[in-house]
């Protein structure tokens, strides 16, 4: 018990000491935020790039398709090549009759009858537990 308390206190002390060290990052420097810029609802960012306005709206789906050049001739849809997104609204609501909705909360009853599905096998030919 005493060893456990020593280990816990030591690990907490080490975590407090190393919590004050410099934070290192890889790849690119992060943008310094002096004020609450990350709570600004008027701007949409994709890796700190301001998106183009289409129909006076900032929208992630409305970004320009030609922002990335393909690496090989042809139509690549791989890394760095955004898919073409159809921005049209489609009304896909399909009403159903009451009582015939197999969605959430509705159980689909197939058959309420009891069937005896026991099928006896010959001794030695049982593929159950502990049988190869």
Curated annotation (Swiss-Prot):
Keywords: Apoplast, Developmental protein, Hormone, Hydroxylation, Secreted, Signal
Domain of life: Eukaryota
GO CC, one annotated term: extracellular region
Post-translational modification Hydroxyproline, affected residues: 70, 73, 95, 98, 102, 120, 123, 127
Chain positions listed as propeptide in the UniProt record: 20-66, 82-91, 107-116, 132
Record GO biological process: cellular response to nitrogen starvation; nitrate import; regulation of leaf morphogenesis; regulation of root development; root development
GO molecular function, one term: hormone activity
Post-translational modification summary for this protein: The mature small signaling peptide is generated by proteolytic processing of the longer precursor.
Signal sequence region: 1-19
Family: Belongs to the C-terminally encoded plant signaling peptide (CEP) family.
Function: Extracellular signaling peptide that may regulate primary root growth rate and systemic nitrogen (N)-demand signaling.
Assembly and interaction partners: Interacts with CEP receptors (e.g. CEPR1 and CEPR2).
The protein's name: Precursor of CEP10
Organism expressing this protein natively: Arabidopsis thaliana (Mouse-ear cress)
């Amino acid at each position: 018990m005493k060893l456990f308390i020593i280990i816990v206190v030591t690990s907490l002390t080490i975590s407090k000491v190393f919590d004050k060290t410099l934070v290192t990052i890889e790849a690119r420097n992060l943008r310094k935020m002096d004020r609450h810029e990350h709570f600004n609802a008027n701007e949409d960012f994709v890796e700190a790039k301001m998106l183009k306005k289409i129909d006076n709206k900032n929208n992630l789906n409305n970004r320009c398709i030609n922002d990335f050049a393909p690496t090989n001739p042809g139509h690549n849809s791989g890394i760095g090549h955004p898919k073409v997104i159809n921005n049209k609204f489609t009304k896909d609501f399909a009403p159903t009759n009451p009582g015939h909705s197999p969605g959430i909360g509705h159980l689909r009853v197939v058959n309420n009858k009891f069937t005896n599905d026991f099928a006896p096998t010959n001794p030695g030919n049982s593929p159950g537990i502990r049988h190869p």
